[in-house]
Amino acid sequence: MKFRILSLSLSEGYKIGTLQEMNLSFSPIVSTGGKLTLEGNDGAEKYANMVYVDLSNNSQIQIKRKSWNLGFYCGDEFRVILNSSYATVAVASEKTDFAAVTLEDAQKAPNIAAGAMSEDFSADWIDDVEGDLTKTAFGMIAENAAENKVFFVASADNKTNTDGTENRSLWYKVKVTRNGEGYRVEYGKVGDTTPKTVEIAKNPIYNFVGLSLESGEKVDAQAEGKKWDIMWAYAAAVSQMASGPVTAFSQDVVTSNSVGGVETAVVMVDEQTTYDNFKVTDITSKADFEKKANVIGTTWRTPAMPGVTNAGVKTD
């Protein structure tokens, strides 16, 4: 904001000096700590939103978790992520031509609609829960368009019929190619022969640009890349069950912005150490910071299950 003195209404005893302009700028106040109630619900659904938290500004941004299916990387490489908060899964077909992929091909493909807790579910159908972009379901988008396979994609609302019975005609088929410095996406239901087409430009403000296959709209998949540290949502995670670690979709997953450079450490404490008396020395002596998305994940709580007597937020 710029202020400039142009004239004076009082002339006697006053005059305009040599400094006639002043610039006033505002910057965010860096938070020293506080409390936030995450607005993950919308009244109709318990975990309707993905909640992005900016710790330095003590602020949050909500994005509807079902507002997008695929995210397109805005960095130097060409990569696509699945929206695990919408329980999105994907598997490659055997073909590279959109029109050549039919419902018959979908019937021969692995059943990506299988429940995450079933024996038929494969972790290969989702992206790496640690956030490693070299381990996504789509893989690197090749420079040669003819090398990119058509993928079958399904999210929570289009995996099966409403009664849970199988219906692979609900799935989408998607082919992604490079388009200059951005992406070109061909998509439609598996029975479509003519694709819908959308071009997506990289936006350096964001880590990813989202695309809704239902509406065809390009949307904000996340908060701005430098304006969030952690995200709370329903999402894919590795949870410790009675039988051991299980990869599944779960509530209350906390994800770190590893793509944006955030590093996270877990520091175990004794009963005498609380949030209020936790010190910097506790971090430097015990912390092992990792640039992984799932360092927190679901580890901050114990899920309710048969045989568990201490379900809830952990105290250590």
Please give the residue ranges for each predicted region:
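Short, aromatic- and glycine-rich surface loops/edge beta-strands on solvent-exposed regions
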Residues: 3-7
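Surface-exposed, beta-sheet-biased, low-hydrophobicity segments with strongly acidic/polar composition
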Residues: 13-316
